């Protein structure tokens, strides 16, 4: 029998978003979307063949599963841990056993690999990281431990794995501004930063990140209202705030829902978190806004670590404006995360209610 020809617009995958800001929604991904993602991955990041292996350290229901198509296309093997979970030692053992290994991992998973103290298996060729913020200090530690094998992606379920990125070479002999960015537009994707009125933001100006291209979903399953709000004039409104620099590198500031507005000034939690994590007494940090009668919102930092509030205040005031400093610190054993390693900011806000 002849192979059946499928309309590229046909629904191929109903991909549910991670739901970090609310109820999970089903992004309708077509065959065209998955092919555009596959072509961009092969063009920008990796070139697997029949001697390559994709090791599924992250859940296959999320980013790791979306990377199956480019590796299947090239005849690579799929390696699934028997634990069905991310165990750093098991992951490294699998990489030592299989040839030409690549993997998609959340930044928190990369940090756990570094914490093992084990050297990089020679067969571990590529780690693509994404799905959450990779702080510059954490990235430098990972590169010191494993070498120049890292690739960054910025994407969403609505534009699977494919908005911007940094190649391996972009991580080498560069500055912190590049390492702290999410790279430049991927192949076949247009990316822009827009003000609230829809006008383009200039270099250095912060606005909402939007993108368009064959990678963008058809809409949300049985959710026309959310589709209308997210897909406008051919652009996918990501809900993320960011800015381009003069070189074309995009820096992700925060989710628009996570921006703290205090006394009329926008405070971007990621900036504060990045600096908090530079302190040796901080293992994890999550910054959110808390309601305040006088200021509208004030900054609150949830800390996993031993540094005192006084030490953190001193550390911050040497590095950022005073109005961005947390008004209080909450110490917890671990930041709440979903199964993909993303910090659940809404749960942090609920703790303050």
Located regions from the model:
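Adenylate-forming
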Residues: 24-26, 37-43, 67, 91-92, ...
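Conserved pre-ATP/AMP-binding loop-to-beta segment of ANL
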Residues: 1-16, 23, 47-53
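Gly/Ser/Thr-rich phosphate-binding loop
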Residues: 73-76, 100-104, 114-177, 190, ...
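Conserved S/T- and glycine-rich ATP-binding loop of Class I adenylate-forming
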Residues: 11, 17-20, 54, 60, ...
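AMP-binding/adenylate-forming catalytic core of the ANL superfamily
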Residues: 103, 213, 218-219, 229, ...
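Conserved AMP-binding/adenylation subdomain of ANL enzymes
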Residues: 35-53, 61-101, 116
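Conserved ATP/PPi-binding loop(s) of AMP-dependent carboxylate-activating enzymes
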Residues: 184-188, 196-230, 267
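Conserved AMP-binding A3 loop
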Residues: 12-39
């Amino acid at each position: 029998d002849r192979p059946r020809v499928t309309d590229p617009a046909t629904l191929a995958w109903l991909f549910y978003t991670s739901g970090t800001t609310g109820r999970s929604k089903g992004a309708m991904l077509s065959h065209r979307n998955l092919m555009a993602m596959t072509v961009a991955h092969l063009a920008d990041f990796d070139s697997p063949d029949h001697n390559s292996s994709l090791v599924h350290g992250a859940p296959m229901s999320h980013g790791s599963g979306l990377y199956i198509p480019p590796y299947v296309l090239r005849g690579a093997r799929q390696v699934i841990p028997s634990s069905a979970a991310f165990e750093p030692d098991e992951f490294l053992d699998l990489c030592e056993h299989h040839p030409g290994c690549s993997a998609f991992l959340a930044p928190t998973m990369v940090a756990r690999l570094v914490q093992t103290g084990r050297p990089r298996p020679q067969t571990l060729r590529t780690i693509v990281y994404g799905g959450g913020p990779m702080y510059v200090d954490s990235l430098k530690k990972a590169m010191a431990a494993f070498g120049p094998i890292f690739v960054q992606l910025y994407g969403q379920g609505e534009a699977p794995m494919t908005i911007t990125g940094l190649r391996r070479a972009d991580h080498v002999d560069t500055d912190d501004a590049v390492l702290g960015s999410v790279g430049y537009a991927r192949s076949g994707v247009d990316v822009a930063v827009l003000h609230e009125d829809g006008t383009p933001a200039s270099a250095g100006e912060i606005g909402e990140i939007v993108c368009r291209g064959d990678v963008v979903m058809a809409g949300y399953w049985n959710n026309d209202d959310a589709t209308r709000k997210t897909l406008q004039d051919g652009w996918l409104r990501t809900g993320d705030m960011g800015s381009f620099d003069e070189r074309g590198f995009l820096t992700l500031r925060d989710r628009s829902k996570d921006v703290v507005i205090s006394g009329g000034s926008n405070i971007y939690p990621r900036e504060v978190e990045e600096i908090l994590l530079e302190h040796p007494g901080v293992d994890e940090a999550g910054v959110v806004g808390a309601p305040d009668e006088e200021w509208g919102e004030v900054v609150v930092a949830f800390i996993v670590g031993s540094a005192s509030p006084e030490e953190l205040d001193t550390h911050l005031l040497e590095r950022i404006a005073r109005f961005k400093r947390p008004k209080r610190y909450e110490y917890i054993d671990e930041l709440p995360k979903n199964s993909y390693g993303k910090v659940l900011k809404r749960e942090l806000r609920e703790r303050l209610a």
